[in-house]
Amino acid sequence: MSKVLVETSARHVHVSEKDLETLFGPGYQLTVKKMLSQPGQYACAERVDVVGEKKTLTGVSILGPCRKETQVELSLTDARSIGVKAPIRESGDLEGSGACKLVGPKGEVVLEKGVIAAKRHIHMTPADAEAFGCKDKDVVSVKIDSDGRALVFGDVVVRVSPSYALAMHIDTDESNAACAGRDTMGEIVR
């Protein structure tokens, strides 16, 4: 067993409860639109605009549930196009990350930090990690054999938790480079 489903993670925002209330009003609760592959994670009906120095990305999805800190995940193409810095980071590693403004129907939030390009990663349960011979924070390479665009992604971080479901996450730039689709599988090649 060395194959893993490869999922494309498009631009999105994780909001804190405080910022959610600023953007949508006091006491506001997120509306589940669609459950995602990771247990307990969901796409919301709510959307916000992400404002950079050059341009605005309108209608960016919010993913729930709320987090401790607001985080904006963009592809490097998105970040460059709107004029924001988006260092490649693991989720939650926000110190020294990019700044932007979020605009919702009831208010605005200016983020001094929080914009990142998510480091490509694989979610695994402890049983998956054992089967793959991996441990939390290992860095592996993954080969994707797409027609005409086969490639090997290096620097893929393994994240292990009993609350995860097995899946690799790449952003839209990476997905396009690999010609990845809905049922794309990757092979850990170390």
Go through the PLM ranges and name each one.
Residues 150-152:
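Short coil-to-beta-strand transition motifs
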Residues 5-7, 12-53, 58-105, 110-137, ...:
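Short beta-strand-centered segments at strand-helix junctions
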Residues 146-148:
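Amphipathic terminal alpha-helices
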